[in-house]
Design a protein with these regions (language model features):
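Arg/Lys-rich amphipathic alpha helix in sigma70-family domain 2
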Residues: 103-122, 141
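C-terminal flanking helix
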Residues: 57, 61, 82, 156, ...
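Short, charged helix-capping/linker segments at alpha-helix termini
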Residues: 42-51, 61-80, 184, 206-209
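Sigma70-family region 2
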Residues: 42-43, 69, 79-96, 115-117
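A short pre-motif secondary-structure segment
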Residues: 162-166
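Acidic, proline/glycine-rich intrinsically disordered inter-domain spacer in sigma factors
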Residues: 126-153
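N-terminal module of bacterial RNA polymerase sigma factors
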Residues: 1-59, 66, 153, 200, ...
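DNA-recognition helix of helix-turn-helix
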Residues: 174-204
Length: 212
């Protein structure tokens, strides 16, 4: 579904190289585009919201699934998030659409999770990993990504969330702090600890070149 790089040797949030500024420029352009599409919807053109759903539908579902561990419920909740935008049409500050979207999704996921009856889940068991993940094919990108997803599922949920937001959703530490309700300092600390935890898990699965 998604192509994810697991090389943690470079932290885009802590570098001042020209590439860093190029990335930041792209982030600003992306945020501007999001706000333009949302304003397009507010002005009466549904294509704006359709474009936002197409852009964020899958990654938002994956984020929610990290809380619910049920992709079908996650898809329904993703639609609920956009339904909220349909009906309430909240005012969102410039540059804040993505953070607002994920913050709303997080709130709905936690509320939904608190209302569910406890269910026995095989995810809670510590079983032997699929042997295919430990075979020689691990050098192939598809296998590395599969191992990454497995290791992410084994992590502390708080660390997993901040790594997902900052690396896979390309959020700044400030945006991740807004989504999770934490401070930038806390996010910085959690990213560091999360990378160390992920590196150890990857090494356990035979990947030794994922340095933090």
């Amino acid at each position: 579904m998604f192509h994810i790089e697991y090389d943690l040797r470079q932290d885009k949030h802590l570098t001042d190289t020209p590439l860093h500024f190029s990335i930041r420029k792209k982030e600003v352009n992306a945020m501007t585009c999001d706000e333009a599409l949302y304003r397009q919807y507010l002005s009466g053109d549904d294509e704006g919201l359709n474009a936002l759903m197409k852009k964020y539908g899958d990654p938002l579902t994956l984020y929610i699934d990290g809380y619910l561990h049920d992709v079908h419920e996650a898809e329904e909740l993703m639609l609920d998030v956009f339904a909220y935008l349909f009906t309430k049409k909240p005012r969102i500050r410039d540059g804040g659409f993505k953070a607002y979207l994920y913050k709303a999704a997080r709130h709905m996921a936690l509320r939904h999770k608190s209302k569910r009856k406890p269910l026995f889940s095989l995810d809670a068991l510590t079983g032997e990993p699929d042997g295919r993940l430990l075979a020689e094919e691990v050098i192939r990108t598809e296998e590395r990504n599969r191992i990454l997803h497995f290791c992410m599922s084994e992590m502390n949920p708080d660390y997993r969330e901040v790594l997902y937001l900052t690396y896979f959703e390309d959020m700044s530490y400030a945006q991740a702090a807004e989504v999770t309700g934490k401070t930038v300092k806390q996010i910085t600390n959690m990213v560091y600890r999360g990378k160390e935890s992920l590196r150890r898990l990857l090494e356990r699965e035979g990947i030794t070149n994922a340095e933090s």
